[in-house]
């Protein structure tokens, strides 16, 4: 039996607490790291790897496909709000967030996070794990 709540708790420890404000984990040109929220100039920020806009508990929209999010049960009104960021990574994600900072309600953020986590675990992680048995 999969202990989803235990996995989600672990993810929150790794990814950080749930956040309703979209951000991109970045390196700063002036040194160090910081999350970019779209409210300041992008010139001092460089996305870590292929990071995209992240929200909830580690839901990186740059790594997502709309069809998967829909299949996993993300509500249509949430998809409408996150659509501009889906699939965008690095510089493209920074520009999109700069032009339109993202904030979801707590209910929307929780719905997105749970649907993405359950969907990813059920369709990717568990089948991969089962192949190893």
Feature map (PLM): residue ranges:
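Acidic, aromatic-lined catalytic clefts of primarily extracellular/periplasmic carbohydrate-active enzymes
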Residues: 1-133
